């Protein structure tokens, strides 16, 4: 554990260019250059990378994989308190009233205007498409649409929490469908039903036919507790959850299509939440530069996986 911690600490201090590997290579054999024994790489780092990248086969380009692992080494893991909707709600709350419109169907867009189904045409000085890859390509024909990786997330409730605390539990042996799991109620109690523990688990790739039974059997082995009394609260399968980053992949794809037209999202960076946020910052900086707006943020921002 000490060697692993030291290796991750060194990685966290590594600047981006040396940390990034050749774009044409994959990370199928796991991260290299950390000086760790094979059992640590196979039992911990490979499952961790698979979790960070939603890529159980680790066909992701080495550069993208190294960037994702470095973000983890720098900031660890985090989730927004109150659920994934909390972050955009906080961003919207900082803007003037009536700035944000939701539930609007955009039918066409260009540098000077946005056409909507409900509100007609809206004028603009510049346009930023902050959407998934498919929606961006529909509005901007010519943008490349990548392949996608499917992900299934299951939420179980239990009378008592398994004794793992706030830890992320990885399947180092790849002995079942679950790639990683955590007792989410220990991390963020607001997500759990009152009086119950909430366990959130992720299946990468095609899920098994008998999903709940297979997952609960695997969770019993991972947590070392009986799961017969656990209740499946919800299961969400997304066949296009994460853009694939198979080699060669450029994790710093341009966000400026041309002056006045910008696009951001996990498909322009690493296919992670951190990558989506980073591409958004790159796009915002490009817009401020092109509009000659002073006062752009120049300090470092928190990073995590």
Which stretches of residues belong to each language-model region?
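Helical element adjacent to the flavin cofactor pocket in flavoenzyme catalytic cores
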Residues: 64-126
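Generic structural signal for well-ordered, non-membrane alpha-helical segments
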Residues: 20-24, 37-45, 80-84, 88, ...
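Conserved flavin/dinucleotide-binding core of flavoenzymes
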Residues: 189-305
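Mid-domain catalytic core of redox enzymes
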Residues: 107-212, 221-222, 304
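Mobile amphipathic helical/loop "lid" adjacent to a hydrophobic cofactor/ligand pocket
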Residues: 1-59, 70-74
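A short alpha-helix-loop-beta-strand transition element characteristic
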Residues: 36-43, 148, 163, 228
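Alpha-helical scaffold segments in soluble metabolic enzymes
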Residues: 47, 86, 90, 282, ...
């Amino acid at each position: 554990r000490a060697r692993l911690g030291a290796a991750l600490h060194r990685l966290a201090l590594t600047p981006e260019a040396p940390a990034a590997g050749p774009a044409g290579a994959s990370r199928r054999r796991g991260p290299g250059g950390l000086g760790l024994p094979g059992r640590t790489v196979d039992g911990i780092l490979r499952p961790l990378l698979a979790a960070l990248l939603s890529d159980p086969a680790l066909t992701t380009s080495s550069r993208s994989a190294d960037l994702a692992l470095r973000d983890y080494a720098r900031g660890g893991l985090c989730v927004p308190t109150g659920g994934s909707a909390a972050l955009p709600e906080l961003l919207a709350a900082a803007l003037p009233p009536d700035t944000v419109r939701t539930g609007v169907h955009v039918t066409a867009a260009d540098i000077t205007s946005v056409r909507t189904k409900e509100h007609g045409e809206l004028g603009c000085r510049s346009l930023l498409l902050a959407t998934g890859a498919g929606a961006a390509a529909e509005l901007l024909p010519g943008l490349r649409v990548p392949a996608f990786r499917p992900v299934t997330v299951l939420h179980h409730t239990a009378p008592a929490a398994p004794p793992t605390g706030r830890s992320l539990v990885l399947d180092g042996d790849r002995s079942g469908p679950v790639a990683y799991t955590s007792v989410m109620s220990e991390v963020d109690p607001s997500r759990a039903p009152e009086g119950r523990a909430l366990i959130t688990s992720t299946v990468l790739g095609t899920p098994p036919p008998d999903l709940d039974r297979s997952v609960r059997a695997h969770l019993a082995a991972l947590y070392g507790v009986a799961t017969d009394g656990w209740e499946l609260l919800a299961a969400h399968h997304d066949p296009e959850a994460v853009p694939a980053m198979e080699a060669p992949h450029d994790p710093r794809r341009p966000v400026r299509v041309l002056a006045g037209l910008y696009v951001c999202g996990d498909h322009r960076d690493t296919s992670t939440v951190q990558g989506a946020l980073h591409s958004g910052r790159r796009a915002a900086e490009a817009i401020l530069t092109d509009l000659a707006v002073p006062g752009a943020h120049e300090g470092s921002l928190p990073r995590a996986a």
